[in-house]
């Protein structure tokens, strides 16, 4: 007997079936025989103990699990014959045992399906794509950054200023007790880089070489070591060295030395920097828009997620996490010690992130479906070429290492963002949006 049931609240198709009792009995007997072959009894060679005598030593749970494992592929095939195209099944199933004994087996398969999604009016979002207007100050700042990057650092004997690179020692205390990871010696820091928690670098300004001072800060709420979050801390610091940046001088000779194509004079450099700033502003606007638009849409829609999909995404995040630790040569135990996390804390974080990523992926997919956004072969080839150029690999290498489906999803998601920008941008940016839409750059 087979029964189908769609579960919209979990986006699953449940197929429940009662196994053929004769077949189940056969698999159970095979499992008994395999388990009996592992039994050792005095007077019998290993694997030669009669089943009648071996049964008393068998683990019933192990027999059931083995029988089910052997029978499962056939049962899954049987269940799959009851799936139709309109079910929109998107992944292999998980299963639950409804009833199981030596003579009977009832099992249900839960197939993840494309969820029912009712999107809000994504064509009229409160979030708008807005490009920051370029000012003369922006161009001057770009020039200054370039000159500083091409400049040199010299050691000075004066109080610390913004932009300096200092070498210093520090030791942190919470409730007047030293804490793990809060101490360092001969640490280099660019003042103004915001590498440390808020307020730390600002209090270093004005300090002098060889003199000690106390700095008071509060760890942020979302700090990576969660036991330190929102805690007040005191850092004892000592400046060892101060280096000041001596920027390069802006001349036509300097510009020519940069070897930028078609840029040989100061005026040409300014045009180049203006174009660069515009591209940066567009890219920054896209990133902000995507984040805020997805948040706005996500807050107005419920997306049911199948347990199997959540588990697969958690597994993927876990693999990436462990791969990153391995690359950085950090043992898991050491990471847990430093961060004060437990493995359950990490799993819980992965679960939250997995649900968020899956929800966003279905929002992308639903908009793509409604707007008829399908990648073309030309777009696929162009995307592969860009990846090859960016990574320094050949087109063939990219095609072999990055799956076709993954590239198609990336292109589709980009088309969705472009479409949302088309619907939700400020009037002042109409010309830039239209130009870049035509050039496929937004």
UniProtKB/Swiss-Prot annotation:
GO terms for cellular component: cytoplasm. Its EC number is 5.2.1.8. It is found in: Cytoplasm. InterPro entries: PPIase_dom_sf, PPIase_FKBP_dom, Trig_fac, Trigger_fac_C, Trigger_fac_C_sf, Trigger_fac_ribosome-bd_bac, Trigger_fac_ribosome-bd_sf, Trigger_fact/SurA_dom_sf. Pfam families: FKBP_C, Trigger_C, Trigger_N. It is an enzyme of class 5 (isomerase). The keyword Iron does not apply. The keyword Cell division applies. It comes from the Bacteria. One of its GO terms (molecular function) is peptidyl-prolyl cis-trans isomerase activity. It catalyses: [protein]-peptidylproline (omega=180) = [protein]-peptidylproline (omega=0). Residues 163-248 form the PPIase FKBP-type domain. GO terms for biological process: cell division; protein folding; protein transport. Keywords: Cell cycle, Cell division, Chaperone, Cytoplasm, Isomerase, Rotamase. Involved in protein export. Acts as a chaperone by maintaining the newly synthesized protein in an open conformation. Functions as a peptidyl-prolyl cis-trans isomerase. Consists of 3 domains; the N-terminus binds the ribosome, the middle domain has PPIase activity, while the C-terminus has intrinsic chaperone activity on its own. Belongs to the FKBP-type PPIase family. Tig subfamily. This is Trigger factor. It comes from Mesomycoplasma hyopneumoniae (strain 7448) (Mycoplasma hyopneumoniae).
